[in-house]
């Protein structure tokens, strides 16, 4: 069923918004982050039952119900510890084996970073458990962030601590 052939009664009950979100998710317009070890988005959306089992076991509460009820990662709630409980709780075949990399997300620091405006801040470095963020001293200026992308595991610990929301996680596979 598409939005075009949605019965009038369901339209009036608000079903069009859920259906529209579902169609956008299936067309891979989704720009959020799925749980670690998730399969490609089109397969994920087709197989996920939106039961919420993965949400209830997430120890850091970063998994939330997103568009059309599908689980998404919100790093502003915390970081991913890669505990794998979401994978273990799911009864559907929507996850890769846990011996593979959990995802290809890496840190991206925007131009709103305080250090780029000559304001001292190192909260991202302080919060990074992988020590992937370092600061290079500048002669007569404020130290600038340097990211070791090989060390960054995409856990998102740096996101929550940033006072100006200058940090996001980007999927390197989508940028190739």
UniProtKB/Swiss-Prot annotation:
Coarse class of the protein's main subcellular location: cytoplasm
Cofactor note: Binds 4 [4Fe-4S] clusters or perhaps rather 3 [4Fe-4S] clusters and 1 3Fe-4S cluster, leaving Cys-113 out of the cluster ligands.
Residues noted as binding [4Fe-4S] cluster 2 in the record, renumbered to the chain: 80, 83, 86, 90
Binding site for [4Fe-4S] cluster 3: 113, 121, 124, 128
InterPro entries: 4Fe4S_Fe-S-bd, 4Fe4S_Fe_S_CS, Fe-S_Ferredoxin, NapF
Matches recorded under Pfam families: Fer4_7
GO cellular component: cytoplasm
Names of required cofactors: [4Fe-4S] cluster
Binding-site residues, [4Fe-4S] cluster 1: 48, 51, 54, 58
Sorted UniProt keywords: 4Fe-4S, Cytoplasm, Iron, Iron-sulfur, Metal-binding, Repeat
Residues binding [4Fe-4S] cluster 4: 152, 155, 158, 162
Residue ranges occupied by any 4Fe-4S ferredoxin-type domain in the UniProt entry: 39-68, 71-100, 119-138, 143-172
Location relative to the cell: Cytoplasm
GO MF annotation: an example: 4 iron, 4 sulfur cluster binding
NCBIfam families: napF
General function of this protein: Could be involved in the maturation of NapA, the catalytic subunit of the periplasmic nitrate reductase, before its export into the periplasm.
Subunit text: Interacts with the cytoplasmic NapA precursor.
Family the UniProt entry places it in: Belongs to the NapF family.
Name this protein carries in UniProt: Ferredoxin-type protein NapF
Natural source organism: Haemophilus influenzae (strain ATCC 51907 / DSM 11121 / KW20 / Rd)
């Amino acid at each position: 069923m598409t939005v075009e052939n949605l019965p009038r009664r369901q339209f009036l009950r608000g079903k069009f918004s859920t259906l529209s979100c579902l169609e956008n998710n299936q067309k891979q317009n989704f720009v959020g982050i799925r749980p670690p070890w998730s399969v490609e988005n089109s397969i994920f959306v087709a197989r996920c039952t939106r039961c919420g089992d993965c949400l209830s076991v997430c120890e850091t509460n970063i998994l939330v119900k997103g568009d059309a009820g599908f689980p998404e990662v919100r790093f502003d709630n915390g970081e991913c510890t890669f505990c794998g409980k979401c994978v273990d709780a799911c009864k559907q075949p929507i996850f890769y084996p846990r011996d593979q990399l959990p995802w290809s997300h890496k840190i991206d620091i925007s131009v709103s970073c305080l250090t780029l405006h000559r304001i001292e801040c190192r909260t991202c470095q302080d919060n990074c458990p992988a020590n992937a963020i370092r600061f290079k001293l500048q002669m007569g200026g404020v130290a600038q962030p340097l990211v070791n992308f090989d060390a960054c595991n995409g856990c998102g610990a740096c996101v929550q601590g940033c006072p100006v929301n200058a940090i996001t996680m980007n999927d390197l596979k989508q940028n190739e």
